[in-house]
UniProtKB/Swiss-Prot annotation:
This is Dolichyl-diphosphooligosaccharide--protein glycosyltransferase subunit 4. GO terms for biological process: protein N-linked glycosylation; protein N-linked glycosylation via asparagine. GO terms for cellular component: oligosaccharyltransferase complex. The keyword Membrane applies. Residues 26-40 are cytoplasmic. It comes from the Eukaryota. Subunit of the oligosaccharyl transferase (OST) complex that catalyzes the initial transfer of a defined glycan (Glc(3)Man(9)GlcNAc(2) in eukaryotes) from the lipid carrier dolichol-pyrophosphate to an asparagine residue within an Asn-X-Ser/Thr consensus motif in nascent polypeptide chains, the first step in protein N-glycosylation. N-glycosylation occurs cotranslationally and the complex associates with the Sec61 complex at the channel-forming translocon complex that mediates protein translocation across the endoplasmic reticulum (ER). All subunits are required for a maximal enzyme activity.
Length: 40
């Protein structure tokens, strides 16, 4: 059976992983695709 401490650790690790996944998705999405024209 899963104890309260194990459940808390699992949920915290899962939350951090999902948060970092969202941050990485936004970072990759914002920095790819549209090339920025260079100012002369």
């Amino acid at each position: 059976m899963i104890t309260d401490v194990q459940l808390a650790i699992f949920s915290n690790v899962l939350g951090v992983f999902l948060f970092l996944l969202v941050v990485a998705y936004h970072y990759i999405n914002a920095n790819t695709g549209k090339p920025i024209p260079k100012a002369k």
